[in-house]
Amino acid sequence: MDIREVFARNLRRSRQTKGLSQEALAHEAGIDRTYISALERSQYSASISTVDKLATILGVEAADLLKRPAKAPRAAKT
């Protein structure tokens, strides 16, 4: 999973957890809804300032939007 996919997944999850629509998030961030949609579909890469702005609105750290999911531990072979 590349960093755009990681960001897309975390952005969507954080937005939904906060209970915001793409439209509401875009309005608060001062950007277009279609840009939020494209970010959530891994179509565009966000600038550092956009990542920071979105994180602030979502109430998370910017780094949280870039964190890869933890890998599940593998079951030991018997």
Predicted regions, residues:
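Short, charged recognition helix plus adjacent turn
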Residues: 64-78
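DNA major-groove recognition helix of helix-turn-helix/homeodomain DNA-binding modules
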Residues: 49-64
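A detector for short, charged/polar N-terminal pre-domain segments
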Residues: 1-6, 73-76
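Recognition helix of helix-turn-helix/homeodomain-like DNA-binding domains
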Residues: 30-44
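Conserved hydrophobic/aromatic packing and binding residues within compact polymer-binding modules
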Residues: 11, 25-26, 36-39, 65
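Residues within helix-turn-helix
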Residues: 23, 34, 52
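Short basic helix-loop element that most often maps to the first helix and adjoining turn
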Residues: 9-28
